[in-house]
Amino acid sequence: MVISSNAFIVGRVGELDLITAGWHFLQRTMNNEDRRGFEKMISMPGFCVKKFEETYLLKRVNPFAQTEEGRIIKFNSSDCPCGKSQDVHNISAMKDQLSNFLDKWENVHEKFSLPTGSSELTTSKTPIDVDTKEQENRLKQKAEAAPKSTPIENHKKNIQALCKQNAVAEQCLWNVYHVSGKPAEKKEQRNDMDRNISGVSVKDYETLKNFEDKSPPQAENASSSKKDEPISVECTDETSSRLSPATDISHEMAEHGTPDSGMISDVSEIKVLPAGKIEKKLIKELNPEMMVGRDGRRYRQKLREAEKQATVEFKLENFEQTNGEAQSVENDILTGKEKRRLKDKLRKEKKEQSKLFVEKDLEKNKESSSASLSTNKLAESPTEADKNSNVIHTNIKPKDICIETEYPANNDNKKKSEVMFSSTVTNVFGRNENQTSFDVKEHTVDSFELLPGEYRISNFGQQMADTTSAEMTALGKMPQEAGEVKPTVREHSGANFLQRERNFPLSLKTTVIANSPEGDIEGKRLSKGQKRRARNKANKGVYVVNENGSHSIELLPGEYKLLELDENKKIQEFPIDTRHYMRDDQTGGGSKIVEQGQRTKKKKNFYVAGNLSKNILDNGKWLAYVIDDKNSDGVPRVGEVSTEEVQETIKLLDSKISHNAIQDNSCSEDFEFGSSSSTNFVTGSSRSLLPELDADFVRKTLADYEENATEDAAENNNEVFESASEELEMFMNSEGIAPNFHSEFAKKTSPLLVGNAEFKDFCSKYSNSKYDNKTISKLVKKYIDTRIVHHYERFKKLADRESHRIAKSWTKIYETSSYSLMVMLYTNSPSSSVGFSDLEEILFNDR
């Protein structure tokens, strides 16, 4: 909002007038008890004049009133920035010094003023008198030589010297001094007092006292007989008149104040804090939960980080207790990416350990097929493998796992190396050498890539690769033993890497989902890029919610992303890739891609837009991603939600998907007849909102509805239906002459419409539509109902008797002819030259 300079200045002047009038009113209405309370209030260290004026004077509230409003509104000095200052004690000390200074000055003025005439004084000059006169002359010479300064200037210098380092205290003291401490005497009288008192020195108290006691009686003539009064600190009435344009002051300015609230000065703008020690002291004194601004946000962020770190350390301690061989994790503060990596690492280790302890009972029925596969591979002769240019021998044992590589014969430096992993594999996964070992014949794993000269094992977990890298040693070629597998090797054209197929235990396979009792849950292979894209979508709040992936829903923080929970309590996310992979033991060979349409069992509980059936809600359980906006990492957590929560979430998603919002149709002709958006919306919705908007309700409330309207309808029904199809033809065939209409409505409207070329063109354009009499009567009734409701509401709000008469007259009209429908459509069109008021003037002109 932009405020002009004129309005701003006028508002400020008016605000100052309100404050001035408020102070005068407060001074006139205070009694003795109120004065004592007010004196205590202004003596408080944290008292601020600006805050007091904003709270009471601008709002015209008497702080000493005994009404309910006065008792509710109390002045709180803690809200003022002055009360939060660390130097409130200095402020009170300076106020005490000011009061002591004024009291002392008054006492000195009264006691040590120049002596008046006295008859008891002698005129004899003694040596003591000479000495006192000399001392008096010296004092006068010193006072005249020194620069004259008023008490107010000395007081200002004293204040500046005391509170030079504290701007807030200086400002508060300045406010108190200028509001309540300004002298009330006239300028001439104050100058005389300053001139008379300037020569008095407080240090020579005894000398002046002796001089007063022993002064000669002739001093009466030389001394001034005028006795000055003490300085008064009472506020004087303001004599200057100001404009008070109360009508030009906006409500916002008068109620809440302008930017600096019309005070003497803005204390809040002065923020001069000395060192960092004061800030630490303030933080200790203030309540951390009540802190606002940047400091409060930073403090609460540190609290949240400390709580997160405590939970991470607690989980790590529990994990170390249950798994003794897990790696030790440093207790330093981990932030962001390091925490996520640590969580992923721990999750992978736990998953690998749980897979190693899977019982072999579920695999007994598959031993025959996997054993036949392994024997077929062992039947290959070593001579055929040596004919290839590149050969990789892989030996897997229960205790030792070896990798042997042989390079081409034309290579001068033939390198034969093996990598041996002894008991490290079992130690990593929580197994000892004496425990049950792997059975190589039972399972198969995915193929992976191996670069020349590099040896790496995939799908063993991150910790296995780290712990075994230090123990890799080069060994000679070892003979093959029973149970060893020699994989086939093939070279890709135009590439310098080898791809091979190896047989590893199925428990080490990370991308295969655990078996269900029926064996129909299929595994998915997702590349790193696909996983990264899915994770980014989840973090951003965008997720695919239906099976076919035809649309996506954007969710705000705190809402839910629906996922499926299968029979084994495992989360089934919606697939990014439409292809699915079957396991090797099901296909009898390598992994085979199966299209989505060939799957035997359809997944349940997939969200479909608009589907809120009981089967969807009650079939199984639902999980949801809950996005927590307070989580700094932005990683969604997974938790189970109730059916009611799922139902509300689906409603929310449906509202985001649906684009068929109900439009507010101003014209009745825009409604599609027979559709839910026309009949139900006009009749049903209007009845539920306001019964007066229902034309049938208005008809029943009118007086002569049952007597006249129903009888007329019964008499004229047959006539109208017979002549319904004839009136429009009669009008189209007429050439400027009014035809002999049968219905009363057509007869009365013929002078207005017959001869109107625009209406005739309108009828020729839209008269081709064929409606039955029932449809026409319903369409015409909509227009009549609109006019009834319009005039009845006008009668209710404006007490217009003419509108009541017209509404009652519309209830007597029952038209089913196509001519009356054309009249209504033409009158309702925006470009028509005839309105409903013209029709009503002709139809109901019975006065």
From Swiss-Prot:
GO terms under biological process: monosaccharide transmembrane transport
Region (Disordered): 116-153, 208-245, 361-392
Domain of life: Eukaryota
Compositional bias ranges of the Polar residues kind: 116-126, 368-378
Residue spans of biased composition, Basic and acidic residues class: 128-145
One GO cellular component term noted in the UniProt record for this chain: membrane
Disulphide linkage map: none
GO MF annotation list: hexose transmembrane transporter activity
Protein name per its UniProtKB record: Uncharacterized protein C03B1.7
Protein source organism: Caenorhabditis elegans
